Amino acid sequence: MSRRMVAVLAVILAVLCGASAFVWLHAGGQSKTVVHFTPDPPTANDASSTSRAAPAGKSSPTPPMDSKSSANAAPQPGFMPVTGEVLEFTASVAKVSNVASLRLLVNGRKQIAGKDAWHLQAFAHTQNPLRMVFELDDQFDSYSVPGDFASVQYEMHLSERGQKVQSVERLTATGREPAPAGVSAARVLPGTRDPLGMMQYLRSVDWATTPLVHGPVYDGRKLYEIRARKTGSAEVQVPAGKFSTSTVDVKVFDNGVEMNDAHFTLYVAKDEARTPVLLEAVLPFAAARVELRKKQ
């Protein structure tokens, strides 16, 4: 696998699932995972949006959201991350399995910048044979407020091919809050989430009543918009077991323009914890999968 491929996987992964997913959420390959997908029936909104199609020759890079979409849909009643939860994933690219491992942790709640916040963590490591050419050991820390999981502080502690990078950023929508020593300020839109907070937010959504959500995501380098739509249900078999899931199509927009060269599908279990069990990515150079291996 080329360094360029790994770099692209890392960037996309950060946008989607939590900075620490920097390599994993897109490192899923074609393993023994089995998916039996059932699409949702067309909705009235889908039909009406088709009838309102733009005239020929005209297009909009950012189509309007339908009436059921929400940038900050309320979390499902009773949903709350479980302190101490550990999710372990294995990533594959093309026909090469287990190129990387990813651990997502819920490390309780802490006070930061005067706010109560969830401390979410992710640890990513490349595995052999990829590790022989691209050694990567990254850690990501997110401090996200309960409820909508908007980010307060986002940290990247990267070790890639012998080069180490430490980044600690305090997110601000006004630019008026001074960052403490050793911390940089990142100006973002109100309600911006980091990748780890976005993953928890997608888990909190009641997909039965809110089939489409969207909002800004800051990956530690750049601001994107994420749009996630429920497209159906699926029975999914991954190393951790068999799950009934909601199938969520995820699109990434850069400055209002969809990144059409990549397509992502997230499978969220229909259990009380709304566990993310599988992420599929179709990229220009390969298909990737990140599969749940173990849940603690």
What are these regions (language model features)?
Residues 4-5, 18-171, 207-296:
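Acidic, serine/threonine-rich low-complexity disordered tracts
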Residues 1-16:
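N-terminal Sec-pathway targeting helices
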Residues 162-204:
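Hydrophobic, well-structured mid-protein blocks that either form specific transmembrane helices
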